[in-house]
From Swiss-Prot:
DNA-binding region: 127-186
Record-linked CDD domains: homeodomain
Lineage of the organism: Eukaryota, Metazoa, Chordata, Craniata, Vertebrata
GO CC, alphabetical: nucleus; transcription regulator complex
Tissue specificity comment: Expressed in all myoblasts that will populate body wall muscles as well as in a group of cells the migrate into the head.
GO BP terms: cell differentiation; muscle organ development; myoblast proliferation; negative regulation of transcription by RNA polymerase II; regulation of DNA-templated transcription; regulation of transcription by RNA polymerase II
The name this protein goes by in its record: Transcription factor LBX1
Gene: lbx1
Coiled-coil annotated residue ranges, if any: none
Top-level division of the source organism's lineage: Eukaryota
Function: Transcription factor that controls hypaxial muscle development by down-regulating myod1 and cdkn1b/p27, thereby allowing myoblasts to proliferate before the onset of terminal differentiation.
A Pfam family it matches: Homeodomain
Gene3D superfamilies, per the entry: Homeodomain-like
Organism, as annotated: Xenopus laevis (African clawed frog)
PROSITE patterns linked: HOMEOBOX_1, HOMEOBOX_2
Biased composition annotated in UniProt, kind: Polar residues: 228-237
Length: 267
């Protein structure tokens, strides 16, 4: 029992000492202001947060205007609660942070779009490579080889390129183009044969007669072009130096007499 009484007396003495120490403290200068500066009201009353009251308050007022009014609370009290809410300050800070990120992302996206559009407008067209100008000797040798060999082996390709002073790519390209040209020519010939088969016999005869007339006309034109050349050579034939002048004069007189005789006979 004595130990319990001693413990009670020691606890009461400690409480009395604490009370005496609190009584000795000076009273606060402003009793209305709370002692802790970390209360919600102190945070909301800071000047940095007051600036956001207008934006956040208007946003809350607009959102609250869509909702039905709560029962038992007037409009002024609801507006004050929305302005002094700690969620408003948190929302404002978050909106500022995300707003900066959104602006940077949008600017980057706009810059990319502008660069892509600008690049698409000014992308130069790919210039086609200039075609290789082969010499007559090179074309002759290539055509001669193409007559009996349409496809070249690597060894043959190297041999032709070295022989004609060309590159392997040029030889390959020439043979590819030549095979394509041969294929087109064969297709055109097949189309011509099929079209002639579909034609009537009378149309075929008409085509043949037209071709024969064209050939005969060309032959006549050639003969006419040759005849004046022969007349010019006969008229301008040089006289032999061995022929005397008297013989020439006599021949002229005989020709004149013959012409006169021919005229008389004609009459």
């Amino acid at each position: 029992m004595t130990s319990k009484d001693e413990a009670k007396s020691s606890a009461s003495s400690v409480e009395e000492r604490r009370r005496n120490a609190l009584d000795l403290l000076p009273p606060p200068a402003n009793s209305n202001k709370p002692l802790t500066p970390f209360s919600i009201e102190d945070i909301l009353n800071k000047p940095s947060v007051r600036r956001s009251y207008t934006i956040c308050g208007t946003a809350h007022l607009l959102s609250s205007a869509d909702k039905p009014p709560a029962a038992g609370l007037p409009l002024s009290s609801r507006a004050l609660l929305s302005q002094t809410s700690p969620l408003c300050a948190l929302e404002e800070l978050a909106s500022k942070t995300f707003k900066g990120l959104e602006v940077s992302v949008l600017q980057a996206a706009e810059g990319r779009d502008g660069m892509t559009i600008f690049g698409q407008r000014q992308t130069p067209k790919k210039r086609r490579k200039s075609r290789t100008a082969f010499t007559n000797h090179q074309i002759y040798e290539l055509e001669k080889r193409f007559l009996y060999q349409k496809y070249l082996s690597p060894a043959d390709r190297d041999q032709i390129a070295q022989q004609l002073g060309l590159t392997n790519a040029q030889v390959i390209t020439w043979f590819q183009n030549r095979r394509a040209k041969l294929k087109r020519d064969l297709e055109e010939m097949k189309a011509d044969v099929e079209s002639t088969k579909k034609m009537s016999p009378s149309a075929v005869e008409a085509v043949l007669t037209i071709s024969e007339l064209e050939e005969s006309g060309s032959e006549r034109g050639n003969s006419r072009s040759r005849s004046p050349q022969l007349g010019l050579t006969s008229n301008h034939m040089p006289l032999s130096p061995s022929x005397p002048l008297t013989d020439q004069h006599a021949s002229k007189e005989c020709s004149e007499d013959e012409e006169d005789v021919e005229i008389d006979v004609d009459d």
